[in-house]
A protein has these predicted regions:
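Residue-level detector of intrinsically disordered/flexible regions characterized by low predicted structural confidence
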Residues: 5, 17-18, 248, 287
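Detector for intrinsically disordered, low-structure N-terminal pre-sequences
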Residues: 8, 24, 34-35, 76
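Sequence-structural signature of mature extracellular/luminal beta-sheet repeat domains
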Residues: 37-346
């Protein structure tokens, strides 16, 4: 369920750079799983470090608040069939849908944990992705697997097909985020954030927090095994480079060459920063959610151009609409900003 207004006000009052009308959004009545519509407020600011950012983000660009009142949002994905964006609310084990002009509405629950035994922690879906057939793939924390939704878009039910749930006979920790390449191979990260007791959880089976490749024919390979907390993952426009954010120590955004066979080589530090979810535009700029309460924008050469300062913890971002809109999951909110460059895949 969504937080009550009384529980939100103290947190909102501590947030700087938030337009006053956001209090209206936070106090919206919750009826039938819908967040009542309100005039869109704005939040945060744009920090410009390099003049090249002006070609990406216009001087009058603003981050709009599309939805509020969630527990912790993650995994935005644009779905053409719905003409909207889906995103996870992990602690509430739910996926929400936002479409232009309407309120955000509960779209699927449960989304990441389908067990009968009640559990706490981050049990829901995290990263969401469309495969090449247009199906919805989910990194499910609670069920500890990568799954495909086996349901219609217009009347979704919590029916899932398991794509993979273990490596060499041992259950995954809690798959977090995922990316797919042109031939349909799926790459995903597996940190322990979805385990109720983290690395000390007695149900933990794998010693490694790995990155994996699931090929279109169903074979599974561990392609990275030396990152403490692999998190966000995304391909460069030519798919010759795979970026992976490490949210453990030392915090770093890694880059890997992708061989013709799909293996990884030449792992190197791309940018020294903590990071969560990643997105890439068609010019190869890398958008890193998480550090310093916002989204860093980094050139293909690893130079910081600026940031989208949301003023709060930020988990992920993804391009949508016509490709020029960046959707951002930030704490209890879903945000968007219009850019001058398109995201990869548009």
């Amino acid at each position: 369920m969504l937080k009550t207004f009384a529980s939100l006000v103290p947190r909102l009052c501590r947030i700087n750079g938030l337009s006053a009308t956001l209090l209206t959004v936070a106090s919206m009545m919750i009826c039938g799983g819908d967040i009542a519509e309100a005039q869109l407020p704005t939040i945060g600011s744009i920090e410009r470090i390099d003049s090249r950012l002006d070609l990406i983000v216009s001087s009058d660009a603003e981050m709009e608040v599309l939805a509020a009142g969630h527990e912790w949002t993650e995994g935005p994905v644009w779905v053409p069939a719905l003409e909207g964006v889906l995103y996870s609310d992990i602690p509430n084990n739910a996926i929400y849908l936002w479409r232009e002009g309407g309120p955000a509405s509960l779209w699927l629950q449960p989304s990441g944990y389908t067990g009968e035994t009640p559990r706490g922690g981050e049990s829901g879906s995290n990263g969401l992705l469309l495969d090449h057939e247009g199906g919805l793939l989910l990194a499910q924390h609670g069920d500890r697997r990568i799954a495909r939704l086996d349901s219609s878009w217009d009347a979704p039910v919590a029916s899932f097909e398991t794509l993979v749930r273990e490596f060499e006979g041992k259950r995954f920790n809690s798959p977090n985020d995922l990316a797919v390449n042109a031939n349909g191979d799926l790459y995903f990260t597996d940190p322990p954030y979805g385990l109720e007791q983290g690395i000390e959880d007695p149900v933990k089976e794998l010693d490694v927090h790995g990155v994996y490749r699931l090929t279109a024919d169903g074979s599974l390979t561990q392609v990275i095994s030396d990152l403490p907390r692999p998190n966000g993952i995304a391909f460069s426009p030519d798919q010759g480079t795979l970026y992976v954010s490490n949210s453990g120590l030392p915090p770093v955004i890694m880059a890997y060459d992708v061989t013709s066979s799909g293996d990884l080589s030449n792992g190197r530090a791309f940018y020294q920063s903590w990071g969560d979810g990643l997105a890439i535009d068609q010019q190869g700029n890398v958008y890193v959610a998480g550090p310093d309460n916002g989204v860093l924008i980094i050139s293909p050469a690893g130079e910081l151009l600026g940031s989208l300062n949301t003023t709060q913890r930020t988990s992920n971002c993804a391009f949508g609409d016509d490709g020029y809109t960046l959707y951002i999951t930030s704490d209890m909110h879903l945000l968007r900003i219009r850019l001058n460059v398109k995201g990869v895949g548009f």
